[in-house]
């Protein structure tokens, strides 16, 4: 049976307070995720030869290729530039999401839980 103020072995953590914190954090995370999904990041490769625009939802919303890098005799180079720019865009979207979510989860103070 639980003692007043917490559960045995959990350092006096009050489950009601902990649940309120978790619910608040979950709401903040949902709001932040919705905001980040609307943000557009732009990354590039080859010194700006290929640029990619990506949302926080990891949807590609734009690709720009400078005409001077389009060489019919070297399609492989263009493919490599596009791949590098897309990979960088995905990393940037992941980093943005992780960073913002970390700000929320880092604020959670639940002594004795971890």
UniProtKB/Swiss-Prot annotation:
Keywords: Cytoplasm, DNA-binding. Belongs to the YbaB/EbfC family. The lineage of its organism: Bacteria, Bacillati, Bacillota, Clostridia, Peptostreptococcales. InterPro entries: YbaB-like_sf, YbaB/EbfC. PANTHER family: NUCLEOID-ASSOCIATED PROTEIN YBAB. GO terms for molecular function: DNA binding. This is Nucleoid-associated protein Clos_2855. It comes from Alkaliphilus oremlandii (strain OhILAs) (Clostridium oremlandii (strain OhILAs)). Binds to DNA and alters its conformation. May be involved in regulation of gene expression, nucleoid organization and DNA protection. It is found in: Cytoplasm, Nucleoid. The keyword Ion transport does not apply. Homodimer. GO terms for cellular component: bacterial nucleoid; cytosol. It holds the Pfam family YbaB_DNA_bd.
